């Protein structure tokens, strides 16, 4: 997996420009691990977060949707010998998390894809996070541009945190802003972002 420099830009922009007046706990690079999120869940601390924002790689397995994942630091090999996890937080593992978040944002490629099954509906990460306790989940429907994602997420959270907008209203407004912007106007940059409520 290649590095995503925009994720650090994204996290820094959220910390410095959006979440300045609320409690904020940042886990980046080595601390952003599958092992860490599972430990937070097991201890009950993950349930204390009203927003869980994961800026990382996403993986969709078209042959076996249950293997679709959010990818953490272990995948890079940087935590070899430190973590027993493989770095792939799969759909079954996600559904077992202990969440009570108003928003889980998967700022990663292909996190909104799933497999539609008769009698079950869509098997995918959005549903797994909702089963785990998230009230809403923001995802992407395809591979997304790193820089555009950082800009989209920063604007979206600013509208929610600073302007008091709902998440759905913030998503609509940021998409409209992107459409009107010469740099971000192409649907590739904004249309992938959807919100499940």
PLM feature spans:
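Catalytic cores of enzymes
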Residues: 1-197
